[in-house]
Amino acid sequence: MATDGASCEPDSSRAPEDPAGATAEAPKKEFDVDTLSKTELRMLLSVMEGELEARDLVIEALRARRKEVFIQERYGRFNLNDPFLALQRDYEAGAGDKEKKPVCTNPLSILEAVMAHCRKMQERMATQLAAAESRQKKLEMEKLQLQALEQEHKKLAARLEEERGKNKQVVLLLVKECKQLSGRVIEEAQRLEEVMAKLEEEKKRTSELEEELSAEKRRSTEMEAQMEKQLSEFDTEREQLRAKLSREEAHTTDLKEEVDKMKKMIEQLKRGGDGKPSLSLPRKTKDRRLVSASVGTEGPLTRSVACQTDLAVESAEPVKKSPLTVHVKPSPGSPHVSVKGSGGKPGMDRQASHGELMGSALPTLPPPSASRIEENGPSPGSTPDAPGSAAPPGSAAPPGSAAPPGSAAPPGSAAPHSFHSPCASAPPHPGLNPRIQAARFRFQGNANDPDQNGNTTPSPPSRDVSPTSRDNLVAKQLARNTVTQALSRFTSPPAGAAPRPGASPTGDGGAYPPVGRTGLKTPGVARVDRGNPPPIPPKKPGLSQTPSPPHPQLKVIMDSSRASNAGAKVDNKTVASPPSSLPQGSRVINEENLPKSSSPQLPPKPSIDLTVAPAGCAVSALATSQVGAWPAETPGLNHPACSDSSLVIPTTTASRSAINPVSASSCSPGASDSLLVTASGWSPSLTPLLMSGGPAPLAGRPTLLQQAAAQGNVTLLSMLLNEEGLDINYSCEDGHSALYSAAKNGHTDCVRLLLNAEAQVNAADKNGFTPLCAAAAQGHFECVELLIAYDAHINHAADEGQTPLYLACKNGNKECIKLLLEAGTNRNVKTRDGWTPVHAVVDTGDVDSLKLLMYHRAPARGNSLNEEEPKSDIFDLDEGEESPEGISKPVIPADLINYANREGWTAAHIAASKGFKNCLEILCRHRGLEPEKRDKCNRTVHDVATDDCKHLLENLNALKIPVRISVGEIQPGNYGSNDFECENTICALHIRKQTSWDDFSKAVSQALTNHFQAISSDGWWSLEDTALNDTADSNIGLSTSSVRAIMLGHVPWSSGQSFTQSPWDFMKRNKVEQVTVLLSGPQEGCLSSVTYASMIPLHMLQNYLRLIEQYRNVIFHGPEGSLQDYIVHQLALCLKHRQMAAGFSCEIVTAEVDAGFSKEQLVDLFISSACLIPVKQSPVKKKIIIIILENLEKSSLSELLGDFLAPLENRSTESPCTVQKGNGMSACYYFHENCFLMGTIAKACLQGSELLVQQHFRWVQLRWDGEPMQGLLQRFLRRKVVNKFRGQVPSPCDLVCKTVAWALSVWRQLNSCLARLGTPEALLGPKYFLSCPVIPGHAQATVKWMSKLWNAVIAPRVQEAILSRASMKRQPGFGQTTAKKHPSQGQQAVVKAALSILLNKAVLHGCPLPRAELDQHTADFKGGSFPLSLVSSYNSCSKKKESGAWRKVNTSPRRKSGRFSSPTWNKADPSSEGLKNKTISQLNCNKNASLSKQKSLENDLSLMLNLDQRLSLGSDDEVDLVKELQSMCSSKSESDISKIADSRDDLRTFDSSGNNPAFSATVNNPRMPVSQKEVSPLSSHQTTECSNNSKSKPESGVSRAKSFLPVPRSKATQCSQNTKRSSSSSNTRQIEINNNSKEENWNLHKNEQIEKPNK
């Protein structure tokens, strides 16, 4: 008679009784009872009686040993959690043996089982014996083999000894050799030391010699400098002597002429003629002598350039002097400024009157680092001469000195001009012929005619000095005024001419036409232009090297024997050239830095570019009467009209005449003070043209025509063009025509006038450059367009082979390139050096010009250039960078791209060597490029390339193919996977021609590994809650083994597989656009794709699947949005395919539970799916049923599943369930053994009667603060960012990273605050945050999305949860009462305060937007305007004081990290900062749990009692929430909230019910203090009692209330039942402790450390 629950398995303890059982069975088989005699029958009866007695003894022995040994061996390894042991113990400890019914079968069956076990053991022994025999045979064979091996071993040992002897001899020999070699090494080392010592000595000698050599070099350079200085002085003296000689010769010639005239006059006198001419001759001679006496002796003087007077004029011998030429833009190859004639300094006429010596009325700032430079010896004076005194013969103004800015003219100055006078008049030369005045008047317009800028300048009053001119006063006055006004119009720079930023400065005499590019520079700042020649050395005639101004200034062509080219850069003012020792390209101050006139400022007017004809032809009167000329004492010189005298003008200046009169100090040898002509006292002047007795001939007009064209003076140019007989195609010695000068300087109107006048459009200069070449080089695209329209030769090649297209490319002029290409120019022309336009444009590094040259197509012939171009002809430069082939194919052929110059360099060589990576990339896009082409030095493009360009070339033909991970088709909608992406880009692979399949396989594997590590690491997540990160599993379990297949386009490929073609050829031919990696999914019985799609670690999903397969009844529960539905469906799908692979048919049945889902519907579902089977019917084999019940939180679990709990646990016919059918009949059913039941509950914890269901299911809790939910959002958003950045991980400083981190912190802080408020029903899972937008550079979109999420989801849930808690009537059934339909004023205020606190502490805190932008979005959030100080100032007052408690205080959100404004929240008392939560588990309250919580229970029990007693006595419902909100407001840092995360869900307390008489009766004084000594033994007693008393009575609830714990009465009365049930329930389904009772969260202590229950 076995006890209940005994197992039927045999045991070794029954072995001794086996023979008795065998002998008992034998008589039944061998004897026939009917044939036996009496004696035999008696014998048999005695034997059988003995057997019965023996059998009884066996049974008793078995029973005794069962209790002692069998149970211990069978169940000794189980702990108290085994339900079977609990049942056995209860059964045995219950009633006596007589009352028990046998649970197991007859003891005979036990004996039979023992005998059967013995037979099995005998068979097993036989097999083992046979095996032992075979092993013995093998052992003998091995012994024989061992003996043979020993013999071989002996032989080998003998050989080894022989070898050792031989080796010893060899070792001895080696040792001897080593000793010899070591001796040699020592000797060599000694020699080496000696040689090194000698080497050091030689180095010292060498260094000494080098020092001596450097000293000698310094001496030689000093000597060379002295020799150069002396040579320059000798040159200067020679030039001065030549000038003096030429003047003496000229003077001699004049004297001869006068002698001739005297002779003629004597003859006339003899004839009785008039003698008046003899009176003027001595005067002229005297004047000439006076002028000649001062030539070449004085240094440069500072003169005024603001008055307009005639020049002092001298005659010179033109035949002996060649013109001095100054090129404004010198070429490094043509430095020629030679002074072949006079080389003297400008001097002042010693006979000049005081009133005619003009001082500096407007000082100019000196150039930067200007130093005094004495030319031809030191100057005695340090300041400019006072204008009121005549300069002594040796007096000179220092070139570098100038009056300070803003200083007025010195007292005593007789300057006739001021800031208020637009122009100052000067007296005409006395005795000037009226015909000359008429000639001067001929070229002038009306004095009051508007100029080019539309301005009219009135004529100032004239100043007459000489009384000899009074007889011609009217005519001279009119002529002088007109000339002055016209010159004021022609000599000012044009306004508004935009400077072109720098291009390569090439000179007139070089291989390219001059390219002058300047801008208005900062005043006083010296700038060195790249490519300019070095500055002119001192003591040489010349000017500093500066580019031309934006408006062409006065240019005077001169020659010098020893000086390099020079020019002065003048920005809208009159200045002399800076010293030649200044850095090259130094800029002179511009007009903005000058003192402004108080009179209305007129725009600047164009200046004249004056060039002297090479033949010495005179220039008309327009060029002579200029600002800054010194008044002459000489009454008039009657020279020939067409004088051949040379014009020596050492500097170039421009004036802002009639606007801001400016005086400049002469800063360079040879610098002059006159504005336009700048002729000094020694210089032969232009005024003889005007002083002659006859009209000015047309021989000087071509030079003036060139100047007008170069300066853009349309008025003068049009007047000159209207004259008859003028050669408009006249060229100077450099071959520059007027059209060339106008085109070079970009004067479109002048070009149009000249072209209309039929100027030669293709006239070339001496270097072969046409006007189109000059305009293209300078970038004047309007001139280029005009010249092309007049049929200019677009493919004209200069002497060196440069075409206009080449020059435009060389200087990077994109508009000119475009115009020339549209005109059909030839792209294939080459220069003499073998350079093509492609070479030229690549050499500049201009990407846009290169794209135009390569891709811009010429329009069809016949299209007008003025018509708007069709859009198809315009190449999109920006889009072209990505895929120019998609927009347009290259126009230029491969031969041109690969054309090599004289050195063998292609355009790719140039781009690579200069590091122009963008240009090289564009060249590489041309399919015909040959990167392996070698130059004359046998170097490829890669050999000469920089590092960046080498990397580009190495990836030249590389295919950039994206790698994407696909998880297959994600089932739509209702499973919570709307935000999951089917494919994600992880990287881009560069596949080169040399890439092998092994390399490709490794690259794919490495890319996958890096991607999985990147999305699972927390590299750039700066989270405040570090405790949560410590528990996060950084590895999601994916690797290359998770890959199911890899698709190369549409071709499947596996890692390690090789095709006949290389990867590059394969990708090219199959047009593979992407590599898709397919992960193993549920269809293959794996969960890798589910892991990647949901970011839930793989090992957790596998654990969930194991629980389902093991327990078959599993429910997933967690806060809403925890992806329960998705997880369950994916697990069901995986389980289905696994079972189908094992040969089972499987079916998934899904039911969505709602409030109207009844038990009958559930029964029908079970029956229809064959999950419930009638008792009489056998189950269907090889069939699996998976039933999914969604949204179980919407129904009552106890009502829905209460009757099925036991049948679900024991699935057999022995535990059926009775089902009522609709017709009133009932039937018995049982559950199919292969039926899996899964459910989902969107609820953080269970309450009430739902706890009765809990122990019958396996529960999987998805906590928001634990894996997998805790890290899911972080991993998901990180993967989203990586996908958005095409596989790259952005830096932590990126705005996207900050925004994503903010969204993650919002979710965590929000749940922290909600758990702290005790509203677990409002907790949110990560699902709602998966749709966070990731838009690089647009954080506003994320904030807008957050506001919509707050308004649509978060705020309504929080409002509902707060109202339900605030309006709760403290009834036992938590969750069953709802909020009031009409909440009170206090409840509404609590809700508003809670929303405001949550918004500011959880949502807006940490937002990456600036404060100003955040304020714009704050209004979008619902409930953010509540004054938070009301929460802090609220007291638990009675209803009648409630309105007074809620004071309106103006507060704003608390400033956090300088982002929010400071709060006015009141700080709560630290002792009451938070009401401390306690957790008392009533169902499983053992002593250890009590001790772990005892310390926190003792510390603050009195505070909790005060609140609970107050609530129990009927105080305000919202007091507890207000207290909680107060503590949240008073927390000084957000970490206070995040610290709650570790213990918030584990610390629970039961509501103290207002209708609990047992508890209320024990509390007589709500304010009664409770000491810790009283609390400690009570709490300990209570927990011990609950653990040890298995038969507690209902009255024990009253004694429990005496322990002052807030336990509701309803729970206390059920203590005995729950305790008994818990002791007998199956603990294999491990129960969540904190879900065993209805509970409510309260404020937690910051420092409480509570042990979490084991899952």
UniProtKB/Swiss-Prot annotation:
<feature type="compositionally biased region" description="Polar residues">
    <location>
        <begin position="445"/>
        <end position="457"/>
    </location>
</feature>
<feature type="compositionally biased region" description="Basic and acidic residues">
    <location>
        <begin position="1637"/>
        <end position="1655"/>
    </location>
</feature>
<dbReference type="Pfam" id="PF00023">
    <property type="entry name" value="Ank"/>
</dbReference>
<feature type="coiled-coil region">
    <location>
        <begin position="120"/>
        <end position="275"/>
    </location>
</feature>
<feature type="repeat" description="ANK 4">
    <location>
        <begin position="800"/>
        <end position="829"/>
    </location>
</feature>
<feature type="compositionally biased region" description="Low complexity">
    <location>
        <begin position="492"/>
        <end position="505"/>
    </location>
</feature>
<keyword id="KW-0597">Phosphoprotein</keyword>
<dbReference type="GO" id="GO:0051721">
    <property type="term" value="F:protein phosphatase 2A binding"/>
</dbReference>
<dbReference type="GO" id="GO:0090443">
    <property type="term" value="C:FAR/SIN/STRIPAK complex"/>
</dbReference>
<comment type="subunit">
    <text>Interacts with CTTN/cortactin SH3 domain. Interacts with STRN, STRN4/zinedin and MOB4/phocein; this interactions mediate the association with the STRIPAK core complex and may regulate dendritic spine distribution of the STRIPAK complex in hippocampal neurons. Activation of glutamate receptors weakens the interaction with STRN and STRN4.</text>
</comment>
<comment type="function">
    <text>Regulates the dendritic spine distribution of CTTN/cortactin in hippocampal neurons, and thus controls dendritic spinogenesis and dendritic spine maintenance. Associates with the striatin-interacting phosphatase and kinase (STRIPAK) core complex to regulate dendritic spine distribution of the STRIPAK complex in hippocampal neurons.</text>
</comment>
<keyword id="KW-0677">Repeat</keyword>
<feature type="compositionally biased region" description="Polar residues">
    <location>
        <begin position="1550"/>
        <end position="1565"/>
    </location>
</feature>
<dbReference type="GO" id="GO:0043197">
    <property type="term" value="C:dendritic spine"/>
</dbReference>
<feature type="modified residue" description="Phosphoserine">
    <location>
        <position position="1515"/>
    </location>
</feature>
<dbReference type="InterPro" id="IPR019131">
    <property type="entry name" value="Cortactin-binding_p2_N"/>
</dbReference>
<keyword id="KW-0770">Synapse</keyword>
<feature type="repeat" description="ANK 5">
    <location>
        <begin position="833"/>
        <end position="862"/>
    </location>
</feature>
<feature type="compositionally biased region" description="Low complexity">
    <location>
        <begin position="1616"/>
        <end position="1630"/>
    </location>
</feature>
<feature type="region of interest" description="Disordered">
    <location>
        <begin position="1"/>
        <end position="30"/>
    </location>
</feature>
<dbReference type="GO" id="GO:0005938">
    <property type="term" value="C:cell cortex"/>
</dbReference>
<protein>
    <recommendedName>
        <fullName>Cortactin-binding protein 2</fullName>
    </recommendedName>
</protein>
<keyword id="KW-0175">Coiled coil</keyword>
<feature type="region of interest" description="Disordered">
    <location>
        <begin position="270"/>
        <end position="608"/>
    </location>
</feature>
<keyword id="KW-0040">ANK repeat</keyword>
<feature type="region of interest" description="Disordered">
    <location>
        <begin position="1548"/>
        <end position="1655"/>
    </location>
</feature>
<feature type="compositionally biased region" description="Low complexity">
    <location>
        <begin position="377"/>
        <end position="416"/>
    </location>
</feature>
<dbReference type="InterPro" id="IPR036770">
    <property type="entry name" value="Ankyrin_rpt-contain_sf"/>
</dbReference>
<feature type="compositionally biased region" description="Polar residues">
    <location>
        <begin position="1573"/>
        <end position="1591"/>
    </location>
</feature>
<keyword id="KW-0488">Methylation</keyword>
<dbReference type="Pfam" id="PF12796">
    <property type="entry name" value="Ank_2"/>
</dbReference>
<feature type="modified residue" description="Asymmetric dimethylarginine">
    <location>
        <position position="489"/>
    </location>
</feature>
<dbReference type="Pfam" id="PF09727">
    <property type="entry name" value="CortBP2"/>
</dbReference>
<feature type="repeat" description="ANK 6">
    <location>
        <begin position="903"/>
        <end position="933"/>
    </location>
</feature>
<feature type="compositionally biased region" description="Polar residues">
    <location>
        <begin position="574"/>
        <end position="584"/>
    </location>
</feature>
<feature type="repeat" description="ANK 3">
    <location>
        <begin position="767"/>
        <end position="796"/>
    </location>
</feature>
<feature type="repeat" description="ANK 2">
    <location>
        <begin position="734"/>
        <end position="763"/>
    </location>
</feature>
<feature type="repeat" description="ANK 1">
    <location>
        <begin position="700"/>
        <end position="730"/>
    </location>
</feature>
<dbReference type="InterPro" id="IPR002110">
    <property type="entry name" value="Ankyrin_rpt"/>
</dbReference>
<feature type="compositionally biased region" description="Polar residues">
    <location>
        <begin position="479"/>
        <end position="491"/>
    </location>
</feature>
<dbReference type="Pfam" id="PF25408">
    <property type="entry name" value="AAA_lid_NAV1"/>
</dbReference>
<keyword id="KW-0963">Cytoplasm</keyword>
